[in-house]
C-alpha cells in the first residue's frame, strides 16, 4: 500500500499545480463588453475578490509545486514543510473558490440590477449571468476548477497520511 499511496498522493499533487494554474488563467482572461452602460466592459480586475482569486491561485500553485518537489526529493527531511505548504494551499484554494461563488451570487445587488434585492428578482434576473453571460461562464468555470484543485490537495494530504499511518 505504501507505493500505491505515494503514487496517488503524487498524482493529486501534480493535479493541484495544473488545476491552480488553469483556474488563474481562466479568471485572468475573463472579460466581456457589458450590455449596459456600467463602464463599457466587465473584467476580473473590477472585483477585488476576483483579483484575490487570481493571486491565491498562483500562490497555491507555487506552494503546491514546492510541496511536490519536497515530497519527491526530500521526503523524509521536509515533512513539516510539506504539511505547512499543504495547509496554506488548502486555505487559499478553498477561500478563493468561496469568494468567487459569493461574489457571483451577490453581483446583481452590487451592480444595482432592477429587482435584484428580492428573491424573485434574483431568480428572474438569473443572478449576474443574466447580464454578462460569457464573463460569468469564465468566472464560474474558474471557481469550479479551483474547487477541484482544493479537493485534489485534500486527497493528496489524506493519502499521504494513509501512507504514514502504519509506520508509528
Swiss-Prot record:
This is CASP-like protein 1U1. It comes from Oryza sativa subsp. japonica. Residues 28-49, 102-138 are extracellular. One of its GO terms (cellular component) is plasma membrane. Belongs to the Casparian strip membrane proteins (CASP) family. InterPro entries: CASP/CASPL, CASP_dom, CASPL. It comes from the Eukaryota. Keywords: Cell membrane, Membrane, Transmembrane, Transmembrane helix. PANTHER family: CASP-LIKE PROTEIN 1U1. Pfam families: CASP_dom (PF04535). Signal peptide: none annotated.
Amino acid at each position: 500500500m505504501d507505493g500505491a499511496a505515494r503514487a496517488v498522493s503524487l498524482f493529486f499533487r501534480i493535479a493541484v499545480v495544473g488545476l491552480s494554474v488553469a483556474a488563474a488563467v481562466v479568471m485572468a482572461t475573463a472579460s466581456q463588453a457589458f450590455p449596459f452602460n456600467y463602464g463599457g466592459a466587465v473584467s476580473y480586475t473590477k472585483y477585488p475578490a476576483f483579483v484575490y482569486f487570481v493571486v491565491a491561485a498562483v500562490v497555491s500553485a507555487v506552494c503546491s509545486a514546492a510541496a511536490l518537489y519536497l515530497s519527491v526529493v526530500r521526503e523524509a527531511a521536509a515533512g513539516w514543510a510539506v504539511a505547512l505548504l499543504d495547509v496554506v494551499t488548502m486555505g487559499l484554494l478553498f477561500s478563493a473558490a468561496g469568494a468567487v461563488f459569493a461574489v457571483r451570487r451577490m453581483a446583481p445587488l452590487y451592480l444595482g440590477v432592477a429587482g435584484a434585492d428580492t428573491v424573485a428578482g434574483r431568480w428572474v434576473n438569473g443572478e449576474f449571468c443574466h447580464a454578462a453571460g460569457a464573463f460569468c461562464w469564465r468566472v464560474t468555470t474558474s471557481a469550479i476548477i479551483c474547487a477541484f484543485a482544493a479537493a485534489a490537495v485534500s486527497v493528496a494530504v489524506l493519502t499521504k497520511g494513509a501512507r504514514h499511518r502504519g509506520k508509528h
